[in-house]
A protein has these predicted regions:
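Short hydrophobic/aromatic-rich motifs at helix boundaries and adjacent loops
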Residues: 1, 24-28, 91-93
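Active-site pocket-lining segments that scaffold enzyme catalytic pockets across diverse folds
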Residues: 1-17
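Thiamine diphosphate
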Residues: 5-9, 32-127
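Acidic-glycine-rich active-site phosphate/pyrophosphate-binding loop
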Residues: 17-36
Length: 127
């Protein structure tokens, strides 16, 4: 597994002009290194909603690419968004989920299925 900060650095290096919607653990790192903070939309107060917000931006701004930087606990709070995203099929949307097995922001409690859940599999089966 790639450490979250290393993955964030790689994304920042490869970023062109994408709008970045970040939440929870990945956003904590993203805010430290983003080269284009004017195109960043941090959503700390909306745990579980970054995917929905990112989808809305992608649909409203089809010429702009939108990246969502999400946490595993956050996406588990809104798994239904994966079905909605799959249904809309936005070509300008990319969802990155960082898996650390805990609700970091609320004190590090383990997430349900933290060691066994297959988030990539859930996303693929969602469409």
């Amino acid at each position: 597994m790639i450490p979250a900060f290393e993955a964030i650095k790689a994304l920042n290096t490869n970023r062109k002009n994408e709008i970045v919607v970040g939440t929870m653990t990945p956003n904590r790192y993203w805010e430290l290194i983003s080269d284009n903070p004017g195109k960043d939309l941090p959503v700390f107060g909306a745990m579980g909603k970054a995917s929905s917000l990112g989808l809305g931006l992608a649909l409203a701004k089809p010429k702009d690419k939108v990246w969502v930087l999400d946490g595993d606990g956050s996406i588990l709070m809104n798994l239904g968004s994966l079905i909605t995203i799959a249904d809309q099929k936005p070509e300008n949307f990319c969802h990155f989920v960082f898996q650390d097995g805990v609700y970091f922001t609320t004190g590090g409690q383990p997430i349900p299925g933290g060691e066994t859940v297959d988030l990539a599999g859930i996303a693929l089966k969602s469409g």
